[in-house]
Amino acid sequence: MKAGNLGINSPCTNHVMPQCNPDIEIGNEEIFEFKGLKLYTYKMPGHTDGTVVYYAEIDQDKVLFTGDFFFPYGERGEFASTGWKGDLSYSPEKMTQSFSRLYDMKLNVNLVLSGHGIPLFGEKAQDLTRVAFKYHILNNR
């Protein structure tokens, strides 16, 4: 962001972004607290170098916000995708490492909210990381 890597000279025409300074730089495994709600951040490079997922426990729900790292698709969210692979910092190796790390964390989520697709609840939410990891392995050899 600070370097303006995705600025007007970027070959990625749909990612034009001027140089800017973030208010807060998110590190790995930081916790932000808002009125008693703890939001855990985990860097998951691969889709981009800056990909982050968020985890929170809200009431009885264990919620994972995946952004563009992976997301469900299909009418009922029965499939998963890792999305666009055209970013300058896309790395299948880093994505594999990130998936392995997330899978090993065993967050046992019951709600997944992503940057695309429908929200997934219950068993489908719990299984989405595995389904997306499998999609990644089969489509990024």
Tell what function each PLM region has.
Residues 23-29:
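Short acidic-hydrophobic, aromatic-tinged amphipathic segments that line or gate anion-handling sites
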Residues 132:
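A charged helix-plus-loop insertion that forms the helical arch/lid used to bind
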Residues 15-20, 31, 38-45, 49-127, ...:
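Metallo-beta-lactamase
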Residues 1-21:
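Acidic/polar short surface loop at catalytic or gating sites that assists cofactor/ion binding
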Residues 7, 127-128:
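Exposed alpha-helical structural elements
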Residues 137-141:
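Short, flexible loop segments at boundaries between secondary-structure elements
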